[in-house]
């Protein structure tokens, strides 16, 4: 039986290669709700609770370093020890997203436990037909009140890379250019507002054309215009409204170079 299982995994690896998104393909970022992408779209990013788009390279968004909004009750019931608490015992929340609590990644044991949960989510993404995963909040240590470090993030990221590749999924480095994601094993990058913060060069040096750049309307249109002039012919650059709402919803914006 063990031999057959090993043989099956070997065959699966040969049949389902790990492939990064098409370099420079037109991408759409649909985290606020799924909708039919425009015909020109080659790549779409959707939440792990959604379905992939048939015929379009689909990336599965997973909040891997913090709790997903609306799931804190599940974590409290099932894995309370993986929720980061400060020295007074209070949950450490992302100030920008107070529904999200940081995961406690300070020990190898906790990182392994969190990675097992993420792998189950990755497996669900793969089973539904997604080709890649985007684990968010790699930079959670910068909001941890000094409780987490970049070393904790790197160690956990390596586990996520192994988990994704075991499921035959490519995996994205989400933001955090100060960490060399290529050395950690990431296959491509999803970079938000890198033109605004002058970080895009760090991503293209690491990943070449395998970069999906998202600029947001609340920063104005100039950053998007500059990004298109600088990189629009080489990497995926798109403009979205901050809430990434579905098409047909008030405030919806989607532009590409």
Ranges and model annotations:
Residues 1-20:
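Secretory targeting and sorting signals
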Residues 15-257:
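Glycan-processing catalytic domains of CAZymes
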